[in-house]
Amino acid sequence: MMKKTLLILAAALSGVLAAGAQTGREWQDPAVNEINRLPMRSSFAAGERLSLDGVWKFHWVRNASERPSGIGAVDYDDAAWGSMPVPGMWELNGYGDPVYVNIGYAWRGNFRNDPPYVPDAENHVGSYRRTFDIPASWGGKDIFLSIGSATSNVYVWVNGRFVGYSEDSKLAAQFDITKFVKPGENLIALQMFRWSDGTYLEDQDFWRFAGIARGVELTARDKAHLEDVRITPVLDSEYKDATLRVEVETTPRVKSVGLTLRDAAGGVVAEHRLQPAGGKGGYVFEVADPAKWSAETPNLYTLEIAVSDGRGVTETVTQPVGFRSVEIRDAQLLVNGQPVLIKGADRHEMDPVGGYVVSRERMIEDIRIMKEMNINAVRTSHYPNDPQWYELCDRYGIYVVDEANVESHGMGYGDNTLAKAPAYAQAHMERNRRMVLRDKNHPSVIIWSMGNEAGMGPNFEACYRWIKEYDPSRPVHYERAVYDQDGAFTDIICPMYWGYEQCEKYACNNPSKPLIQCEYAHAMGNSLGGLDHYWELVRKYPSYQGGFIWDFVDQGLARYEPDGRVSFLYGGDFNDYDATDNSFNCNGIIAPDRTWHPHAYEVQRQYQSIWTTPVDLTQGRVEVYNENFFIGLDAYEMEWQLLADGRVVKAGRIGDLDVAPQQRRAYTLGFTAADFCPQAKEILVNVAYKLKEKQPLLDIGHTVAKQQFVVREYDCKAGFGLAASARPVEVTRWERGARVEGDTWQVFFSRDGFLAAYTVDGRELMAEGAELRPQFWRAPTENDLGARLHQRQAVWKNPELRLTKFDAAVEDGVAVVETLYELPAVKATLALTYRINGAGEMEVTERMTADKTAEVPNLFRFGMTLTMPARYDRVIYYGRGAHENYADRLSSADLGLYEQRVADQYHDEYVRPQESGTKGGLRWWTVVDSAGTGLTILADAPFSASALPYATADLDVSNFPPQQHFGTLVARDATFVNFDLRQSGLGCIDSWGALPEEQFRVPYGDYTFRFMLKPTVK
């Protein structure tokens, strides 16, 4: 190890001695992260710009040793080259295959990690060439080249001369090319490696693409121009008045700089002219009671910076200014003095078509969805984003945790981490420093993150010290630092995937720092069960201030199937030889195409900031709590509804909500107990808070919060049971089973004792060959698979049901069919009892008796399943909806009357087939055809059910080889109805072992499910 370190240090020394020169070895030299690259500055537009985006000539080789040389020469023959869009990723344009791995590098399994060296084999190299014209008007100006994002590195030539080199795939590489260009036609050439020594710091959990992900452009600026500007707002101790420190760096020809601060209406707030000395100058404005910036109130001022050479203004630059403070005091993160809640999500820059190439329109769409979903914070996991993202977060109000492009997860932690490698100290520091220098002026950036899953050691300690010295106005966080030196090098306790007990233990044990999980609630597939529990704790403990859900959007890549449907591809879909972690990159709150997953509604509900508490609903009295920290509720109106058995019987509106931030106020809704329908089985009250006027990105009438309250709860037991019927019923028992029939109906039981046919008025309610059977299994969710429940609970998938009793008779005018089964694999017995009256209505009891001495794994569910003909294609129900919901994910699913298509029950945006479509809290559930004829199910307790055009086996990916996609499933010509006394929850703590909370599991034991089947005939 020491010998290797000395060799690396020697290489570093040689790099310093040869600064500015190209050796051709830079891509495996950690001491050389750039050649001739300009220092990073804050983001601003200045001068005349010429985009080089578009189609470039392109050449690709599979192995690095095969790369062409001399490509920068003007007369190089590129006639045989192909083409590549810029921006554009190679793998999405026909060059190489997309690779996804979570932990480990894309060469995993084929090359042993040996930093700084990377493989030659499969290290693709892309070479680019194009011409561009320099306008004559640019003569005498400084001309700069900016390459927004190049993975993993880039060499640059202009007109046959070497310009420079850059690493760090997620920050722009900028070069001064003034001396390299000429008026008229010029040639630029780039060469990029898929992997370089910097790749060891870019082991993020995402698609491993190569190419140019952001724009390439030229800028021409006067010789007298602004080099950089730093803006530091400071609020006084009362968070009322402010100062604004402005520091500028200029070129030597600048004689004066005019500073003008304008408010949102364009009015002048303050102005000053300064004369830089040695290219530097500064001034401090005093601003009385400025409008403050926060995610709730994104008030922006504009600073105009007019640069003059003594003869006139040569350049004017603008910067948005947000007056806000960030500090940590008494174990709380404070914004403008308030302990804000971080209702966050982690977000990769990812597009289902463009990969790393994300348009401004897509960014705005993402922020709009965040606003709709009540998300107020985003972590730029795990690298600095496109500068436009921060501009938009400033404008629309999103708190940002800005994360450096440092992740070396594949190297492991402990002594192997690159955080302890001297050779990589420069790269750690450079990536953090350049991020801070670029994004320092954005009010939306409230926290710096030094990286992600890159171990802990001296390299991060140095980064922490530099950031705190340069920018004491913001806290610094880093997850791995939580566990090192008592968290000395992180200002926030920012763990990943702490469970409820661990969060509560920290929060109630006199904490010294705020707890904000940088990743929590892993949203993979059908997930986010238990999100409400996290937020019960957040709202209980002042130092627990929220976290960032992993993650915002599935990373699937779009593929259009022959029938027009879209499948979203994940790791392993492109070849069978690259390393892959399969679908583990699809953990989004939303789908790749930005469709909401059902659990998105749970996020929206738990993240809302207006809460209602019933005080006395018999008099319509409620209390409204404003959880916001900076805005009142005057922009919203409350709409309320009084419902009887799911139907609105009275409604009203309160349009003048006057509740200050963090305050409560009582209101009286326009109903009393006299309005409660005496015959109604259930009385509900719905409240919703809606925008009175259109806001940026949100339409008038958008619902920002809602809740439901039960005034009179539905009693499922009341009236449950067979109604008396004078109509005759007959039972016939023979060796092939039993038949029970009345005057207009008949049912048939197979020789195994299962209900196998149900005919009413000549209409078959059950599909041919189907049976009403017990069901203990579900198609595993991603969380189930991660916990290996499909293996651990496999005994319940298709347990043998050994018939030991089958009796059928008429008792007191009711047909009674009794069956008893032994389940030897699970050491239990199961009794099914059917009582059928003369109207063909059926009361069924499913009773399992467990062996208390046996050790048997949990069940997925305890219920029944039957198959109906496909013409029964609608569900009408009274229960929770309208989206799917489960025992631990139902806070956003309100009770109501719903009518839906069977074809819409399965959420077809899950990238892999899995359990979907269940609706809980059911009072009754009806599956009907277009004429309204079908079957109603009700029980003596609230139950859950689904009706899908797919069998459970169709959705069970454990039945099939890997790489299953919903888009390739074909709906069956049948409707599969599942209904349960209990079904396991979903969980969300993580997707690789954590189970749902204990109260939401279905443990082995005794169960009794009493339900009724009632024909619905119209």
What label would you give each PLM region?
Residues L92, V101, S149, R194, ...:
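Beta-strand/loop-rich accessory regions of lumenal/periplasmic or secreted enzymes
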Residues A21-R108, L187, Q191-W195, W535, ...:
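Accessory carbohydrate-binding/adhesion or oligomerization-edge regions at the termini
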Residues Q22-S43, F111, Y200, G312-E623, ...:
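Extended substrate-binding grooves/exosites of carbohydrate-active enzymes
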Residues E26, L38-S42, H59-V61, M89-L92, ...:
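Accessory beta-strand-rich segments of carbohydrate-active enzymes
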Residues R273-D289, G646-Q679:
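Intrinsically disordered, low-complexity Pro/Gly/Ser/Thr-rich segments with frequent PxxP/GP/PP motifs
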Residues V181-E185, E249-E327, C677, N686-A726:
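Extended acidic/polar, glycine-enriched regions
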Residues D205-L226, G564-E623, E627-V649, L657, ...:
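Catalytic cores of secreted or luminal carbohydrate-active enzymes
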Residues D97, Y105-V118, E167-S169, I177-A242, ...:
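An acidic-aromatic loop/edge-strand motif
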